[in-house]
């Protein structure tokens, strides 16, 4: 004789356990996605800035004229900064358009940028605090040989993004380096 098996299917307990596990995994992935998304915003801002600075350096070499760059921390913008009293002193701003991070990088409203001159300091060992709103500006000059008159450290910060991003322009060579921040400064061993 055969035993009556009833209808085949899953029990309510099995379904509840499965739904609970799927919910937990989905919750964990959403948290991870948000952190990765913010880290990608910082990576994009650093990449755009590095490319813009490199092009400004090339313009100084091509035109055989120093290019002064103005860095506006509050607006997250970079622009060529000619001398209005002596237009021949620096590159005119008509040679290269400004870089405005908020317009270039999508969803970058929470990014904070800070900068500081490097006075014979190693950017890998220079700590730069970057929290809260920033104001003021910095400047940088690329010479006709592509060198920089002063070094500068630029840092991009976004809350809960993990590691911040930093860019260093090394004086006197004008070398532009990009990396992630560490507890003691910047790590330039891997750019991204």
Regions found by a protein language model. Give the residues of each.
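N-terminal leader/signal peptides at the extreme start of proteins
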Residues: 1-10
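Short, contiguous hydrophobic alpha-helices characteristic of membrane insertion segments
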Residues: 9-31
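N-terminal helix-rich module
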Residues: 2, 16, 28-54, 58, ...
């Amino acid at each position: 004789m055969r035993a009556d098996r009833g209808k085949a299917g899953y029990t309510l307990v099995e379904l509840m356990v499965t739904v609970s596990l799927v919910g937990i995994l989905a919750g964990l992935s959403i948290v991870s996605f948000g952190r990765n998304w913010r880290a990608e915003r910082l990576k994009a801002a650093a990449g755009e800035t590095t490319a813009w600075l490199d092009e400004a350096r090339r313009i100084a070499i091509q035109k055989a004229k120093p290019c002064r760059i103005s860095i506006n921390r509050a607006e997250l913008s970079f622009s060529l900064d000619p001398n209005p009293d002596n237009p021949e002193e620096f590159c005119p701003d008509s040679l290269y358009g400004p870089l405005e991070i908020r317009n270039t990088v999508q969803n970058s409203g929470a990014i904070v940028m800070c900068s500081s001159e490097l006075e014979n300091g190693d950017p890998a060992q220079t700590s730069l605090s970057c929290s809260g709103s920033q104001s003021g500006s910095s400047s940088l000059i690329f010479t006709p040989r592509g060198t920089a008159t002063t070094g500068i450290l630029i840092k991009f910060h976004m809350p809960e993004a993990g590691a911040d991003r930093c860019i260093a322009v090394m004086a006197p060579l004008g070398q532009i380096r990009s990396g992630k921040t560490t507890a003691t400064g910047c790590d330039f061993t891997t750019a991204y």
